[in-house]
Regions:
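Generic enzyme active-site microenvironment
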Residues: 23, 27, 86, 107-108, ...
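Short alpha-helices
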Residues: 111-177
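Short, hinge-like loop/turn segments at secondary-structure boundaries
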Residues: 68-71, 123-125, 275-276
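Short acidic, glycine/serine/threonine-rich loops at helix termini
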Residues: 34, 64-66, 117-118, 135
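Hydrophobic helix-and-loop "lid/oligomerization" segment in the mid-to-C-terminal part
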Residues: 2-26, 32-63, 75-81, 159-287, ...
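An acidic intrinsically disordered interaction segment
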Residues: 1-8, 93-102, 126-134
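Active-site cofactor/cluster-binding pocket
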Residues: 66-68, 74-120
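Short, motif-level signal for alpha-helix interfacial/capping segments enriched in acidic residues
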Residues: 2-9, 87-88, 138-140
Length: 326
């Protein structure tokens, strides 16, 4: 199907149905929340019944945005729906919400590694954020761009482009942002809510994690580590680590960051970020994860030092333009 046909099929499916559940990936970020909330507001404007259900709460700064406190946090869907719209989620299991597959599933995503689940699928890997796709969908639905819808689209784009730092941005990105500002978005207020709403515990946790930062011998890769005892000592939480990974990239020489977050035993959630042409999405894929060229993640098991060395070796190869799949 062409892009136009994919959007039209989704528009037709929405028009033929009344009750919708909307969800995204577990531990949702700004693009996940912004995309699903923009869609929810648009569907309600059409007179549809909508419930947004996520496995986890949004990060504290994003809780300030319209409708986000009303998202139902639950491990399973409770209700009868005509369709499930899954936004910005590469695999249905990653929602962390069971029962979604009982409905007509529409899969809208920009992750290259999407597994292709659902009855209708629309992938746009070139989109800088799923929020860009949501803008096109809402335009196709003929729903006016309200301030609430526009704010969530702008939130999605702002956060998933690393504040317009990532190479995924395009002229289209700024055309959409222009439209959201014309609809009443205050970009300064959005930025302040996202980036200037730190608690003291979060600031202390940043200090603890950065204080323990390691730098690979080449000086090009930063290694971060987090566990629950660090959070308790700082008076912070797991969610307070959101955004921390981007700070080492502000150092000119640093080309990539690996952030190990301890889960239990020898299991770690690994977040990856990079600059320019360093494709850490391919590295995440080696470990069963995925994401984008400059932002990705995976889960890894093993001794921490061994994992550090393994990731550094693969990232160094990627920086040098060699294959990391060795």
């Amino acid at each position: 199907m062409t892009l136009k046909a994919e959007i039209q099929a989704i528009v037709d499916a929405i028009g033929a149905r009344r009750r919708f559940v909307v969800s995204s990936h577990a531990r949702p970020d700004g693009d996940a929340i912004g995309s699903e909330m923009a869609v929810a507001f648009a569907l309600r404007a059409m007179g549809k019944e909508v419930e947004v259900v996520n496995a986890d709460r949004a990060p504290a700064p994003i809780m300030q945005f319209p409708g986000v406190p009303d998202i139902r946090i639950a491990p399973t869907v409770d209700g009868a729906f005509d369709a499930a719209l899954i936004m910005e989620c590469s695999d249905l299991a990653r929602t962390g919400v069971s029962g979604l597959d009982a409905f007509f599933v529409v899969n809208i995503d920009h992750h290259p590694g999407n597994t292709g689940y659902g009855e209708l699928r629309w992938f746009e890997p070139s989109a800088a954020a799923c929020g860009e796709m949501v803008f096109d969908l809402i335009t196709a639905l003929g729903v006016p761009l309200s301030r609430e819808i526009a704010t969530h689209i702008y939130l999605a784009i702002l956060t998933d482009t690393g504040s317009f730092h990532f190479s995924s941005i395009s002229p289209r990105t700024f055309e959409i942002c222009k439209a959201t500002l014309e609809a009443g978005v205050d970009p300064v207020l959005v930025a302040r809510n996202v980036f200037d709403s730190n608690s003291m515990g979060r600031l202390k946790l940043f200090a603890a994690v950065l204080g323990a930062m390691q730098i690979a011998s080449s000086g090009r890769v930063s290694l971060l580590y987090f566990d629950d005892p660090m959070a308790r000592a700082a008076g912070g939480t797991y969610d307070d680590t959101d955004g921390l990974i981007n700070l080492p990239l502000t150092v000119k020489e640093i080309q990539a960051v690996v952030f190990f977050k301890h889960v239990a035993g020898d299991e770690y959630r690994v977040s990856l970020r990079s600059k320019g042409d360093v494709d850490i999405g391919a590295i995440a894929k080696i470990f069963g994860g995925g994401g984008h060229k400059n932002a990705a993640g995976c889960t890894a098991r093993g001794a921490l030092q061994g994992l550090r060395e393994m990731f550094v070796e693969k990232i160094e190869r990627a920086i040098d333009g060699r294959s990391a799949d060795r």
